């Protein structure tokens, strides 16, 4: 996968731009899934169409997904501005690995996500941040599944901190 290739290349002393050019990776290929990868690295366009369908049908709310993707974009931008040779930028991080699949479909699971909007935003920010920390500093090139599992353990606490106010009497 592109994440694994980048990670290996960086460990061997390469830089992000050189590794991408050497392996023929482009953002358009990543967007259309015209590149080797795992099952979760399907076409970003197809995944986003499915996400929009679920939003229109009011099956899910966008807050968790937007907070995951927004956090990944902002944090990876900061890191790539600090050292662009060692840290991949926002577009690469948003299009690679299982980022879109995880943010749109796995993180928004009813059973394991917070009930309130504020809790969902904190949940999404945590997922995005942990994912990037694993990608940048961990031994494993992908971090989405681990980040979701870690943040799932915080859901009871988030539900307690950001509980919905009840109106009226029962």
Please report, for each region that a protein language model flagged, where it lies by residue.
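Membrane-helix boundary elements
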Residues: 47-87
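Hydrophobic alpha-helical segments embedded in the membrane of multi-pass proteins
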Residues: 45-48, 66-74, 93-107, 121-129
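Loop-to-transmembrane alpha-helix initiation sites
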Residues: 90-99, 120, 138-151
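Hydrophobic alpha-helical transmembrane segments in multi-pass integral membrane proteins
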Residues: 79-84, 130-142
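Cytosolic-side transmembrane-helix boundaries in multi-pass membrane proteins
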Residues: 136-170
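Long hydrophobic alpha-helical segments that form multi-pass transmembrane helix bundles
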Residues: 1-48
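Short, amphipathic, aromatic/basic-enriched membrane-interface segments that mark the entry/exit
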Residues: 32-40, 57-61, 91, 111-120
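Alpha-helical transmembrane segments
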Residues: 83, 106-115
């Amino acid at each position: 996968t592109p994440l694994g290739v980048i990670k290996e290349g960086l460990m061997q002393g390469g830089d992000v731009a050189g590794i991408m050019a050497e392996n023929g990776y482009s953002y358009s290929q990543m967007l259309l899934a015209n590149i080797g990868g795992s099952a979760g690295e399907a076409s970003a366009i197809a995944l986003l169409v499915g996400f929009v369908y679920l939003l229109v049908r009011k099956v899910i709310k966008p807050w968790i997904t937007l907070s995951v993707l927004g956090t990944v974009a902002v944090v990876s931008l900061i890191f790539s501005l600090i050292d662009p040779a060692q840290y991949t930028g926002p577009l690469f991080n948003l299009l690679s690995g299982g980022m879109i699949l995880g943010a749109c479909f796995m993180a928004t699971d009813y059973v394991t996500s917070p009930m309130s909007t504020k809790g969902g935003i904190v949940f999404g920010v945590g997922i995005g941040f942990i994912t990037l920390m694993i990608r940048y500093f961990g031994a494993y090139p992908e971090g989405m599944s681990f980040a979701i599992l870690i943040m799932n353990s915080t859901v009871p606490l988030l539900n307690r901190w950001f509980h919905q106010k009840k109106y009226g009497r029962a």
